[in-house]
A protein has these predicted regions:
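Non-catalytic DNA-recognition/assembly elements of restriction-modification systems
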Residues: 2, 7-100, 186-236
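DNA target-recognition domains and sequence-specific DNA-contacting regions of bacterial/archaeal
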Residues: 1-12, 64-188, 239-242
Length: 242
């Protein structure tokens, strides 16, 4: 934000307005940083619960192949009808193998994956994984993993974060559906996973809401800066104190 502050044409506005602009922008930045820190803490709690409940006694859990406990689908081409930004007609997120903005590529009309699960990057940053709500479209060979059990999405996400994925040995390095499906992991029973979901789903929902607020605050910050610079809106320093 220092660069943004420096870009404000201070010679054209009064010192008091300059100060208020800085206060507002710094307030928005502070809120964004706090939400990010809260999310990091919540993610750490989920990882700790995973370690305590399962990985501390992983040797006692049954071993299962990922292909037996979840469906795995590789994303295809981008839908013909899509938009880079959310529109009235295009509300369904499209995800690719990228890591920027958690792989969000754009939006389309109809989902191909209906249930909550995890996506795993099959190219580039192989193994980068993110939890997804149901109703999305994976593209460009991104692997969509949909667990059979409630709570399986959180469990597999934690497992994937701890796996060092290997590519399939081809010239173009990639992770394939068969290679992911053939990985054997410790896997608890359905009732234990459901209890795990009861603990972690509220935390995941809080993380989701914080991400939404971060997006809104970032948009507000980015829209507010040029308006303030051009004198098109009045300054209200109370925004920074909410």
């Amino acid at each position: 934000m220092d660069a943004a502050f420096a870009a404000i044409p201070t010679e054209d506005i009064s010192e008091s307005i300059q100060n208020n602009i800085v206060v507002i922008l710094q307030g928005l930045e502070k809120k964004i940083a706090i939400n990010r820190q809260i999310n990091q803490n919540l993610e750490a709690v989920i990882a700790d619960v995973m370690d305590y409940k399962f990985l501390s006694n992983a040797e006692t859990l049954p071993k299962r192949f990922i292909g037996d406990i979840a469906s795995i689908k590789a994303g295809g081409d981008c839908p013909q009808e899509w938009s880079k930004y959310k529109t009235k007609d295009c509300q369904i997120p499209i995800y690719s193998n990228g890591t920027d903005n958690e792989g969000l590529y754009g939006y389309t009309k109809e989902p191909t994956i209906l249930k909550r699960g995890i996506t795993v990057a099959a190219r580039g940053t192989i193994g980068y994984c993110t939890m997804r709500n149901g109703g999305y479209v994976p593209i460009i060979r991104l692997l969509a993993v949909t667990p059979n059990d409630i709570g399986g999405d959180v469990y597999l996400h934690q497992i994937f974060n701890r796996i060092k994925f290997r590519n399939d040995g081809s010239i173009q390095q990639q992770l394939t559906v068969p290679s992911l499906a053939s990985i054997e992991i410790p896997y608890p029973n359905a009732s234990t996973l459901k209890a795990f979901a009861n603990i972690t789903y509220p935390l995941i929902e809080k993380i989701k809401q914080n991400k939404i607020q971060i997006e809104e605050l970032t948009k507000q910050r980015n829209e507010l800066l040029p308006l303030l610079m051009n004198g098109q809106v009045s300054v209200n320093s109370d925004l920074a104190d909410d």
